[in-house]
């Protein structure tokens, strides 16, 4: 999981994952969307692939990349307790603000 965190810390790699979230794409589509060079996109894809976050398949002349969700699920599971913590704190803040509004009206 630590490797996945290190890999997704880079903004272009997160953007690549975002672009691949809904559908597999060839490198050219990623280059166009990111506005960075093809070698740079390929380097990021290699890092993502080495970390197990994306996989590639060949379709005729094209190499299509897609997200592998399994490593991201590990991150999601690790983050779950923190989501509950923040959800509770935000709920507490909302209650406090509602009480302040009620006190001002009284």
What are these regions (language model features)?
Residues 1-4, 106:
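Short, intrinsically disordered or compositionally biased N-terminal tails of bacterial proteins
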């Amino acid at each position: 999981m630590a490797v996945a965190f290190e890999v997704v810390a880079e903004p272009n790699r997160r953007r690549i994952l975002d672009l691949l979230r809904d559908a597999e794409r060839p490198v050219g589509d990623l280059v166009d969307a990111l506005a960075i060079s093809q070698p740079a996109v390929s380097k990021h894809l290699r890092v993502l692939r080495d970390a197990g976050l994306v996989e590639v398949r060949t379709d005729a002349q094209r190499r299509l990349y897609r997200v592998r969700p399994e490593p991201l699920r590990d991150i999601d599971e690790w983050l779950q307790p923190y989501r509950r913590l923040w959800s509770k704190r935000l709920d507490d803040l909302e209650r406090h603000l509602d009480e302040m509004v009620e006190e001002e009206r009284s």
